[in-house]
């Protein structure tokens, strides 16, 4: 199984992962402060 990712696909994946991490962090902070 070989997966060839182009630079734009890798960049998009990193942006999506970072966005999800930020949302999860904000959610955990809001729950912690509640």
Curated annotation (Swiss-Prot):
This is Photosystem I reaction center subunit XII. The chain crosses the membrane at residues 4-24. GO terms for biological process: photosynthesis. The keyword Repressor does not apply. Belongs to the PsaM family. Keywords: Membrane, Photosynthesis, Photosystem I, Thylakoid, Transmembrane, Transmembrane helix. The keyword Transmembrane helix applies. The lineage of its organism: Bacteria, Bacillati, Cyanobacteriota, Cyanophyceae, Synechococcales. NCBIfam families: PS_I_psaM. It is found in: Cellular thylakoid membrane. InterPro entries: PSI_PsaM. It is a single-pass membrane protein. Its main location: membrane. GO terms for cellular component: photosystem I; plasma membrane-derived thylakoid membrane. It comes from the Bacteria. Signal peptide: none annotated.
